[in-house]
């Protein structure tokens, strides 16, 4: 509750309503598009916004299974993420989670924003770690999350290189 600011309180309630209208949490084949329930932009495709913003919300406000289904959505797309990385020249089980349609296919062409959005992998790891932090268990990591995090690590190990002039990885 935000006391003394009814407009902010109304805004928060509206946003919570939108989250609950957008996602029920009972089907791991479903996810939350970046525009949620009220916007058709992006065609309902999945970006990184869910992992950064929505997973923590659902972990803190609903039974943990609801947020776990958001994570399972990504876990079930791991084979497609590995295939996506392989098509781009990465190997050894590296995963690049695409901005996806419901079947896990990359939905953007290379020239658009496919390569500008590779930080989506990091948001998936963030959400997995948030799950463990907020639930106080390692169950999800042990059963599913570690496999995803290893594949993402394999991607980054091939994607970055050390810059001698900058003395850092780029």
Regions found by a protein language model. Name each.
Residues 23-38, 64-126, 132, 139-143, ...:
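Helix-terminus loop motifs that line ligand-binding clefts
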Residues 1, 54-57, 71:
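Short, Φ-rich (hydrophobic/aromatic) sequence segments
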Residues 9, 142-147:
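Alpha-helical scaffolds flanking conserved acidic
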Residues 13-20, 40-44, 48-59, 115-131, ...:
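Contiguous, well-ordered alpha-helical segments that form the cores/surfaces of helical PPI scaffolds
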């Amino acid at each position: 509750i935000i006391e003394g600011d009814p407009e902010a309180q109304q805004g928060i309630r509206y946003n919570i309503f939108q989250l609950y209208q957008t996602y029920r949490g009972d089907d791991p084949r479903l996810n939350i598009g970046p525009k949620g329930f009220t916007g058709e932009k992006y065609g309902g495709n999945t970006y990184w916004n869910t992992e950064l913003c929505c997973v923590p919300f659902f972990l803190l406000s609903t039974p943990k299974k609801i947020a776990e289904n958001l994570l399972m959505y990504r876990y079930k797309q791991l084979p497609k993420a590995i295939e996506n990385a392989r098509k781009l020249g990465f190997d050894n089980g590296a995963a690049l989670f695409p901005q996806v349609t419901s079947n896990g296919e990359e939905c953007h062409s290379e020239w658009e924003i496919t390569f500008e959005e590779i930080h989506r992998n990091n948001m998936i790891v963030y959400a997995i770690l948030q799950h463990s932090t907020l639930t106080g268990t390692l169950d999800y990591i042990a059963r599913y999350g570690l496999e995803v995090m290893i594949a993402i690590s394999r991607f980054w190990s091939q994607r970055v290189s050390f810059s001698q002039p900058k003395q850092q990885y780029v």
